[in-house]
Amino acid sequence: MKSNEIIYEEVDKKVIVNFKTEYIRQEGIWALHGKKKAEEKYSCLLVGKNKDIGSEIINDLGRLHFVSFRENGTIKYKNYNNVYCGFSYAPWQVQDYLYPYIAKEYCALKFVCIHDKSDFQKEQEYAREKEAFFWRNGRPYGTKNRI
């Protein structure tokens, strides 16, 4: 695993970099970058950490490609800065609304390896530094951990 290595990339629904299977069962931090038609540069959309980033990205790709965007959500999606991100979701179905929304809004997407360990602090630092638009620090804005 290499830092800043592209794990998967597509432009206009055409695969540019095939999914790198060596990331299956690999621990680490990934970032999803996207670009809208009218934009020239990619922006950071999401950052995630996992003990198996390859399998997590495969699940995310499934939602991007095979789950249709729905407009029947009831909870406004807000990021870690309490900014409304343009869509609403149904309880317990955040990912099934988020990824189809991203697929609808962005013409170019790439998953990138950021770090080779699942480290929450590094995930936070990267997400804040890159201003990951949809990132939520693990929970909706203003929601505390329950013990």
Where are the regions a protein language model picked out?
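Boundary/linker segments flanking structured domains
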Residues: 1-147
